[in-house]
UniProtKB/Swiss-Prot annotation:
Residues 1-12 have a biased composition (Polar residues). Residues 1-59 are annotated as: Disordered. Keywords: Chaperone, Host cytoplasm, Phosphoprotein, Viral RNA replication, Virion. Homotrimer when phosphorylated. This trimer is stabilized by binding to the L protein. Binds soluble protein N, and ribonucleocapsid. The gene is P. InterPro entries: PP_C_cytorhabdovirus. Non catalytic polymerase cofactor and regulatory protein that plays a role in viral transcription and replication. Stabilizes the RNA polymerase L to the N-RNA template and binds the soluble protein N, preventing it from encapsidating non-genomic RNA. The keyword Chaperone applies. This is Phosphoprotein. Residues 40-53 have a biased composition (Basic and acidic residues). Pfam families: LNYV_PP_C (PF21658).
Length: 300
């Protein structure tokens, strides 16, 4: 084929265009314009890393500042973990105007949820402890009522025994008063002298004491006692005046006597016993005796 016979007039002129060339309104290529490229080549690899670190540092500081602002608006404190997390999310997901507000709001919600969960757990534990205390209180109440019931029963028994003792003493005293009079003892004549005549002298033998009325308390010999012993003797005498059995009083130790008859009760009876005062003191001593029995039962 001859080169002179080829006709290129029908070819599209776009094929002749350069990718970087502009076009006129008639579709023909215009002046070629080249885009600007950064042709600065770092001298070393360290220069390139310094440029990247500089940009990263500035963006991290911006994230921290925005995070501080968002946290301040919602009243929470920014921690290192929050800052590192926000910077990592910024590099991976990007950042817009409300991103950190949502980030701080999410942290606030999570914190509140954890606090509420802990509060609910603490309240449940508190309810369990309250139930345990109620059960223990109920048990203590039952034990106290049982102890009070026993003390009342013992008090009634003691009062009955005191009444029996009083009746026995009164019966014994009545028997002594109603006993027949002592017969006239024989007169023994003693001759003093012939000139003085005879004089009569009556020698009365000693009166026998009923063995049932003898007790260790009444048979104690008189001795020099200390002030503590004299006070204890006064307390024992007060118990006897209150119709306590003498033999039982003799078996009490000084500690028991002081427990039954404290010094204030002895002082109350110092001016004498009226019927009302006697009953009052007797009731207090009975209550002390009940408490003593309860202590002995508990210790055993």
């Amino acid at each position: 084929m001859d080169s002179e016979s080829l006709d290129f007039s029908s070819a599209d002129t776009v094929i002749l265009r350069s990718p970087n060339a502009g076009t006129n309104p008639d579709g023909h290529p215009d002046t070629v314009e080249c885009p600007d490229f950064d042709t600065d080549i770092p001298k070393t690899s360290d220069d390139s890393s310094k440029m990247d670190n500089k940009g990263s540092s500035s963006s991290s500081k911006a994230v921290k500042d925005l995070l501080e602002l968002a946290a301040k608006s919602q009243g929470i404190v920014v921690t290192d973990v929050m800052q590192n997390t926000a910077i990592a999310l910024h590099h991976n997901l990007g950042l817009d105007a409300s991103s950190l507000d949502w980030f701080v709001a999410g942290i606030t919600f999570a914190n509140n949820s954890m606090i509420m969960e802990k509060m609910v757990s603490a309240i449940k534990e508190l309810q369990i402890e309250v139930r345990n205390i109620q059960v223990a209180s109920s048990g203590i109440k039952g034990t106290s009522e049982e102890l009070v019931s026993k003390m009342k029963a013992n008090k009634n028994d003691i009062v009955k025994e005191l009444v029996k003792t009083r009746d026995s003493v009164l019966s014994a005293m009545g028997g002594i008063l109603s006993a027949p009079e002592i017969e006239q003892q024989p007169v023994k004549t003693v001759t003093i002298g012939a000139s003085q005549g005879r004089r009569k002298s009556t020698v009365v033998p000693p009166i026998e004491i009923n063995p049932e009325l003898e007790s260790p308390v009444l048979s104690k010999t008189v001795s020099t006692a200390t002030p503590e012993e004299r006070i204890r003797h006064e307390k024992e005498k007060l118990l006897a005046d209150l119709d306590w059995e003498i033999g039982e009083i003799a078996q009490y130790t000084p500690l028991i006597v002081d427990f039954l008859v404290p010094d204030d009760i002895l002082a109350m009876a110092a001016d004498g016993l009226t019927p009302e005062l006697k009953e009052k003191i007797q009731n207090e001593i009975i209550e002390n005796h009940i408490a003593l029995m309860a202590l002995e039962e508990y210790s055993s």
